[in-house]
């Protein structure tokens, strides 16, 4: 274990730890995917272990499921849970209206299904993920492998009529082969640079034959928790306008690392 966490890991831990404070005994939770969400799973496991917190977790990817089980969190399927109290997940970008780009970890389909089956979605992120306009991060689109090149052409044609600055579309690879999602689909990354109007773009993409889902999360996120490299953390709620500022005890992060043997 490093003597000190990097500023980026400090920020991710701070956001994750504050978000896990929102979890109550008996909740059914959506467990996100990605490096920040992995911190959340670790923090949740700490509460389960130390407080006897009883929760059920619905993971949004195979790797999140494996981590949650390894740390002692009860894992169930969404069909078993049926509906969730809260989902906590990361984001690749978010704007002032809490519109998101997600899918950098190729789990966007399960992430969106789980988030929309929840009473509340809380996004955890470091401060660098907040942007004035979405689009600097490539927008992932999950597509069926059959005819994916035709689907790509249809996406490129659709982008011609959209308020975006870039229109390059690339197939995401794993080594020399197409990356496969948990559902055995492909990911096309849309390099748009700036998205002027996310909502019509999201609707248009999902009308294209061969598109399974896109990484724009519109009207899904309720709360954003932002961590900073010095341990400060802010919580912002969209509907209530609530804004809280605080800080996190970083010794707890080091304890989590030590307990996990990292």
Curated annotation (Swiss-Prot):
Reaction(s) the record says it catalyses: aldehydo-D-ribose 5-phosphate = D-ribulose 5-phosphate
Pfam families: Rib_5-P_isom_A (PF06026)
Primary enzyme class: isomerase
Recorded superkingdom: Bacteria
Gene Ontology biological-process entries: D-ribose metabolic process; pentose-phosphate shunt, non-oxidative branch
Described purpose of this protein according to its UniProt entry: Catalyzes the reversible conversion of ribose-5-phosphate to ribulose 5-phosphate.
Protein name (database record): Ribose-5-phosphate isomerase A
Annotated source species: Cereibacter sphaeroides (strain ATCC 17023 / DSM 158 / JCM 6121 / CCUG 31486 / LMG 2827 / NBRC 12203 / NCIMB 8253 / ATH 2.4.1.) (Rhodobacter sphaeroides)
Encoding gene (name): rpiA
């Amino acid at each position: 274990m490093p003597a000190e966490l990097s500023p980026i890991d400090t920020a991710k831990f701070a956001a994750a730890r504050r978000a896990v404070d929102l979890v109550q005994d008996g909740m059914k939770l959506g467990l996100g995917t990605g490096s920040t969400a992995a911190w959340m799973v670790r923090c949740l496991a700490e509460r389960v272990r130390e407080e006897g917190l009883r929760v059920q977790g619905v993971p949004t990817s195979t790797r999140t499921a494996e981590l949650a089980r390894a740390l002692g969190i009860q894992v169930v399927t969404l069909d078993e849970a049926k509906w969730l109290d809260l989902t906590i997940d990361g984001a690749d970008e978010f704007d002032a209206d809490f519109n998101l780009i997600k899918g950098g970890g190729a789990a966007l389909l399960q992430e969106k299904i789980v988030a929309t089956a929840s009473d509340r979605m809380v996004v955890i992120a470091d401060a660098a993920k907040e942007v004035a306009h979405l689009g600097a991060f490539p927008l992932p689109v999950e597509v069926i492998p059959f005819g994916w090149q035709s689907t790509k052409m249809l996406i490129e044609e659709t982008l011609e009529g959209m308020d975006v600055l870039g229109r390059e579309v690339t197939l995401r690879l794993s080594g020399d082969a197409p990356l496969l999602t948990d559902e055995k689909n492909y990911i096309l990354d849309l390099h748009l640079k700036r998205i002027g109007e996310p909502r019509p773009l999201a609707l248009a993409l999902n009308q294209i034959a061969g598109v399974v889902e896109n990484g724009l999360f519109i009207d899904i996120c309720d709360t954003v928790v932002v961590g900073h490299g010095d341990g400060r953390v802010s919580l912002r709620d969209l509907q209530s306008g609530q804004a809280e500022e605080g800080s996190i005890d970083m010794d707890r992060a080091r304890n989590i690392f030590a307990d996990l043997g990292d």
